[in-house]
Every structure is written in C-alpha cells, then in structure tokens.
Amino acid sequence: MDARELQDYLQAHIPLSAAMQVTVVAVEASGVTLAAPLAPNINHRDTVFGGSASAVAILAAWSLLHTRVRAEGVAARLVIQSNAMEYLLPIASDFTARSALAEPDQWPRFMRTFARMGRARLRVTAELQGDGHVAARLSGEFVALAMPTP
C-alpha cells in the first residue's frame, strides 16, 4: 500500500482524518509519516489542540499496523486498547507524526500469535514534530482481531 492508497483509505473509512486535513507523507515497513496543518487543528491558544495531536499520533500508529498486516495478506480488525501521550512542547505550526513499532523484533511473534489465536497485541509508538522539534510522543497498545467469517 502506497501513500496515496493509504490516504484514500483513511479519508473513506476514518472521516476525521479528512476533517483534520491529514495527509500521508510516507509509508514504509519501518513507519508511517502523516502531516496535518495547524488551521483545522487549532485551539484557543493558537497552537495544535491536544486532541488533534493525539488523534494524528494514533492514526499514524494504526496506519503502520494496517499497512504491515495488509502486506502480510492478512485480514484483521485493528483497534487501540490503551495509550499514553506525552506532550513536550506546544505546536504552533503544521506538524507531522511518525510511527514505529516499539519492538520491531516482536513482529514475527505478533503474526504467529495472530495466526494461532486469532488475536494479537503489539505496542506502537509515534513521535510528533512541530516547529522543528519533537513536541509529543505516543505509546499505544493495539490489538489485531481475526475478521469474522460470513
């Protein structure tokens, strides 16, 4: 799945991404990079609203799992189970979120567990950059669930 395909998917299936004007910058096995402008995500302090920052970080993390699972040829529902967001600096500009697997060496185990149990859990991180600085970090636990058979 390339950047255009992912962006089309997000806009069709996660309408909030379109409202926030999120664009897909890069899709790689090591991470997904998303970008969002300040204007539709602004708060009363003329910086990025914390909820927008969190949403873009979660979207980047979810997108990484989505693209990796699809590349494996597996159909799975992906949901976030829990997350922690650390806000380091206010963002007064357009911003990006770059996701990564917290422990890349756990991917084979994740896929084996999913194949055997029909569900598996994995931690994904995302780092937000704004104004040329790391502004926030997300750590999230995501769960892959087998799709029900008709």
Which role does the model predict for each range below?
Residues I91-A92, A102-P150:
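HotDog/MaoC-like acyl-thioester-processing domains
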Residues M1-P15:
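Extreme N-terminal tail/first-helix region
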Residues L16-V48:
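Catalytic strand-loop segment that frames the active site of acyl-thioester-processing enzymes
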Residues A18-V22, Q81-Y87, R109-M111:
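Short structured motifs
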Residues P37-W62, V74-A75:
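Hot-dog-fold acyl-thioester-processing enzymes
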Residues L34, Q81-N83, A97, L122-V124, ...:
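Hydrophobic residues positioned within well-ordered beta-strands of beta-sheet architectures
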Residues L64-P104:
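Hydrophobic beta-strand-centered segment that forms part of the acyl-chain substrate-binding groove
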Residues H13-A19, E72-R77:
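Short secondary-structure junctions
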